[in-house]
Amino acid sequence: MAKKVVALIKLALPAGKANPAPPVGPALGQHGVNIMAFCKEYNAKTADKPGMIIPVEISVFEDRSFTFILKTPPASVLIRKAAGVEKGSSEPNKNKVASITREQLREIAQTKLPDLNANDIDAAMNIIEGTARNMGITVNS
């Protein structure tokens, strides 16, 4: 028989740098999960993506075991990295902070496609382009 899920925890952690300090410790500790086991597993699986924020969905079972699914980094992080800026514009409709090319947009959309509610790459590109526009980053064709 399948194990019963008692909690679903969503966290966004830096790749390869999860430690028992907040936010990881309190979130997992209240469900009785072995925090160090999670940190070691997460860091091992994300060691090849340094500097990225990787969202993770942790399923905790009633016997205190857990499984987790790694998601793709947030679109805003990928866009900022491609544009080479620290943060987006505070007034995106007035001042633009950077620009990215169509190829960079396609690359980001390709990366995000499994997590987006889109059927093809063009729909994914439109979603990512909207995110970029809201950050004050223009897309050059």
Swiss-Prot record:
Alphabetized GO MF terms: large ribosomal subunit rRNA binding; structural constituent of ribosome
Pfam families membership: Ribosomal_L11, Ribosomal_L11_N
InterPro entries: Ribosomal_uL11, Ribosomal_uL11_bac-typ, Ribosomal_uL11_C, Ribosomal_uL11_C_sf, Ribosomal_uL11_CS, Ribosomal_uL11_N, Ribosomal_uL11_N_sf
One term under GO cellular component: cytosolic large ribosomal subunit
CDD domains reported for this sequence: Ribosomal_L11 (cd00349)
PTM comment: One or more lysine residues are methylated.
Family: Belongs to the universal ribosomal protein uL11 family.
Main function: Forms part of the ribosomal stalk which helps the ribosome interact with GTP-bound translation factors.
Family matches, as HAMAP family: Ribosomal_uL11 (MF_00736)
Quaternary assembly: Part of the ribosomal stalk of the 50S ribosomal subunit. Interacts with L10 and the large rRNA to form the base of the stalk. L10 forms an elongated spine to which L12 dimers bind in a sequential fashion forming a multimeric L10(L12)X complex.
Protein name: Large ribosomal subunit protein uL11
Organism for this UniProt entry: Synechocystis sp. (strain ATCC 27184 / PCC 6803 / Kazusa)
Gene name linked to the record: rplK
